From Swiss-Prot:
Biological processes annotated in GO: defecation; lipid transport involved in lipid storage; locomotion; neuropeptide processing; positive regulation of defecation; positive regulation of defecation rhythm; positive regulation of intestinal lipid absorption; positive regulation of locomotion
Classification via InterPro entries: Galactose-bd-like_sf (IPR008979), Kexin/furin (IPR034182), P_dom (IPR002884), Peptidase_S8/S53_dom (IPR000209), Peptidase_S8/S53_dom_sf (IPR036852), Peptidase_S8_Asp-AS (IPR023827), Peptidase_S8_His-AS (IPR022398), Peptidase_S8_subtilisin-rel (IPR015500)
Phenotype upon changing G184E: In sv76; intestinal lipid droplets are smaller and their number is reduced. Reduced uptake and accumulation of triglycerides in the intestine
Free-text disruption phenotype from the record: RNAi-mediated knockdown causes a reduction in fatty acid uptake. RNAi-mediated knockdown in the intestine causes a severe defect in the expulsion step of the defecation cycle.
GO-annotated molecular function: serine-type endopeptidase activity
Keywords associated with the record: Cleavage on pair of basic residues, Disulfide bond, Glycoprotein, Hydrolase, Protease, Secreted, Serine protease, Signal, Zymogen
Protein name: Endoprotease aex-5
Annotated disulfide bonds: C286-C316
Cell compartment(s), UniProt: Secreted
Signal peptide boundaries: 1-17
């Protein structure tokens, strides 16, 4: 058994993480039971107070008494001398931001009436309503007594990670209505505000936002919560969309997402649905968002009624598809059993989650990878306007802001109903990409799903760097676009993820093209790993 302590130092409360100035630590202690774990904690001046929810061997603890701040380093060093302590590391506090609704005006429309059509009503008419599916909205809480949500709500797949309680209700303020709005788009039952896309789904509410700071342990704990009972995690938040920030999941959270995608749902894989971001007006792009640009998440853009990508929407090479409604106020649930309206990429993640819930209702045996294959095959590229689409060698059209096109719920459920699970995933990795030329001729992946390039950019103004990846078949994917507002130094240990090569044969020579907009600047790009995942035909 492996036990992990989360040690909150000098905190006013062990639950609400308001101030990280004095440090938060994560320690892993092996081969002991819970009683011994608590004894070890007290020996080092800490007391384990409760278990984290998603790990049977993880504990939250706090100091027994005050010590001088300089003693922290001594405590860490002392604990590392113990044979039972595998590691101890300091956690950083950080903020996460809701993909807040845009200030669009107009009469609210229902989700099934969006233009261009997502063919949601047609999927319902085919008999699918997500009654066999569980969707958890990870946000600032949900009004679980709302007349349109209370029947769908399940406490078994819900938790409040802000106050560590079973009822994830939000504060009664418009500022904390976001989760309730997203939940309505997924699961509202038509009593007052309309029907959610997956109006028969079981609704989980995981309250994570609403405190001043998060940390890696809380975030990872929330995203691993009830991973064998929850099918879809709907996430409409992320790092700040200011065109300057670059953040990614920390170690514990990244492991939670990876483990869920590979092993959740009893081996079929959880589906983590992420909003691509609202930073388009700031020149932002989701390649700098490590939750969206992630091997194990599914991210979605948004288009307006004309079919053009929404001006506020962010694009990147990991965006899988898009939903409509970018210029609409979409009616949904509000606090205190009211109706409200929402737009922005927050809505896109919730709508996409609802559509995927219909797909799983059509075929509960689908894996997380099956969902990606179905979306790539059925998305409607012809609905997209005002941008140039690119075609890969497998015949799929794509664009960074819309992926493979507009989701089509009816085509998805029809294809899903008779879909046979894809073959086991094959992975090829190449290390030390010194010259940007990757010989992948010996790889068995003949149908690509994703390509991941990992490394660092050393540059005085990282926003001036552009990275493109060319496949052996000539398809070019922009892994890192220019970002004019970003004048920060360096981008370290980053994963650049692309779905643009979906269906291509990976064998042959791949080429990385790196340029800087600034002349006479010394910079380097250190790419350490090239990874392609897919199937062998």
């Amino acid at each position: 058994m492996k036990l992990i302590f989360l040690l909150l130092l000098f905190g006013v409360s062990p639950i609400v993480c308001q101030d990280f100035e004095d440090g938060v630590f994560l320690a892993k202690i092996t081969s002991i039971d819970e009683h011994d774990a608590r004894k070890i904690g007290r020996r080092f001046g800490f007391e384990a107070q409760w278990k984290l929810q998603s790990y049977t061997d993880v504990y939250v603890g706090r100091r027994l008494r005050r010590r001088k701040r300089g003693i922290e380093d001594e405590i860490v060093a002392e604990m590392m001398l113990s044979q039972q302590v595998q590691f101890i590391e300091k956690l950083q506090g950080f903020r996460r931001y809701k993909r807040a609704p845009m200030t669009n005006k107009g009469y609210p429309v229902h989700v099934w009436n969006l233009t261009p059509s997502l063919y949601i009503r047609e999927a319902w008419e085919d008999g699918f309503n997500a009654s066999r599916v569980t969707v958890a909205v990870v946000d600032d809480g949900v009004d679980i007594k709302h007349v349109d949500l209370k029947s769908a709500f399940s406490p078994r797949v819900s938790f409040d990670f802000v106050r560590f309680g079973d009822l994830p209700t939000p504060k009664n303020s418009k500022e904390f209505e976001h989760g309730t709005q997203c939940a309505g788009l997924v699961a509202m039952e038509g009593q007052q505000c309309g029907l959610g896309v997956g109006h028969g789904a079981t609704l989980g509410a995981i309250k994570l936002l609403g405190q001043d700071f998060l940390n890696d342990a809380l975030e990872g704990d929330a995203l691993a919560f009830q991973k064998d009972l929850i099918d879809i995690y709907s996430v409409s938040w992320g790092p700040k969309d200011d065109g300057k920030s670059a953040e990614k999941p920390a170690k514990f959270t990244e492991e939670a997402i990876k483990n869920g995608a590979l092993h959740g749902r009893n081996g079929k894989g959880n589906i983590f649905v992420w909003a691509s971001g609202n930073g388009g007006v700031n020149g932002d792009n989701c390649a700098y968002d490590g939750y969206v640009s992630n091997e194990y998440t599914l991210s979605f853009g948004v288009i307006d009624a004309s079919g053009a990508p929404a001006a506020y929407g962010e694009g990147c090479s990991s965006v899988l598809a898009a939903v409509s409604g970018g210029d609409a106020m979409i009616q949904t649930t509000g606090l205190e059993s009211t109706c409200s309206s929402i737009s922005g990429s927050s809505a896109s993640a919730a709508i996409a989650s609802g559509i995927i819930s219909l797909v799983l209702d059509a075929n509960p045996t689908l894996s997380q990878r099956d969902i990606q294959h179905l979306i790539a095959r059925t998305s409607n590229a012809s609905a997209i306007r005002d941008v140039e689409l690119y075609e890969n060698s497998a015949g799929l059209n794509f664009h960074p802001k819309v992926g493979f096109g507009l989701l089509n719920a009816q085509k998805l459920v029809v294809m899903a109903a008779t879909w046979e699970n894809v073959a086991p995933q094959v992975t090829c990795e190449k290390m030390n990409l010194a010259n940007g030329i990757i010989d992948n001729s010996d790889c068995d992946v003949t149908k690509v799903e994703r390509v991941i390039v990992s490394g660092s950019i050393i540059h005085p103004h990282r926003g001036q760097v552009q990275i493109r990846l060319e496949s052996p078949r000539g398809t070019i994917s922009e892994l890192l676009p220019l970002r004019p507002k970003d004048t920060s130094r360096d981008l370290l240990d980053w994963n650049f993820v692309s779905v643009n090569f979906f269906g291509e044969n990976s064998r042959g020579i791949w080429k990385l093209h790196v340029t800087s907009e600034e002349d006479d600047v010394d910079f380097r790009v250190e790419m350490k790993m090239f990874k392609v995942v897919g199937t062998m035909s």
